[in-house]
Amino acid sequence: ALTESIVARSQGNYASVQNIADDVKAKLGGGTIGVIFPILSRNRFAICLKGIAMGAKKVVLMLSYPSDEVGNALLTYDQLDEAGINPYTDVLTLEKYRELFGENKHEFTGVDYVEYYSNIIKEAGAEVEVIFANQPKTILDYTDCIINCDIHTRARTKRILLAGGAKVVCGMDDILNASVNGGGCNEKYGLLGSNKSTEDQIKLFPN
């Protein structure tokens, strides 16, 4: 079977991080943007985050815990139990997270995703604030312009945020769902299903 990447390559469905930045700025205003529930992935999400941060003045990065949607763990439930933390209700600041859990490098890759994602945002020229929470509404205490990066729960997350008073909510499927400055796009999925191609280029899901 043809892999997605081969099909995408034959279609030339590529976009630049600058295309992402321009789309994010146009749709979310370029100020403080909440980026919530991303997966922890160097290949899939890191390059999207770079583009998003280039289109923002500040990024409030809200990570789900103890793991992301596809099971990449930041923490174990044992660690949460030991610290007396309830992931359903408790919101952790970066300071609190570090105080309780330290560095927490990823079990297989050795990457501290909290630090890694923070550095991507800073290097893209934006300020960063990191929080840990599992209720979508929490982000509304920080900003009303939000990109919800979850995949299977994205419609529900968007609904909760809009009902809670968010001004603008974009899913990953709403970014690059039309061409920006001649770059690639996917009308149905936008950035969903995309992969890093180079440091400054992303390979989108074939149309």
Residue ranges and their predicted role:
Residues 5-207:
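Conserved mixed alpha/beta catalytic, RNA-binding, or beta-rich assembly cores of soluble enzyme
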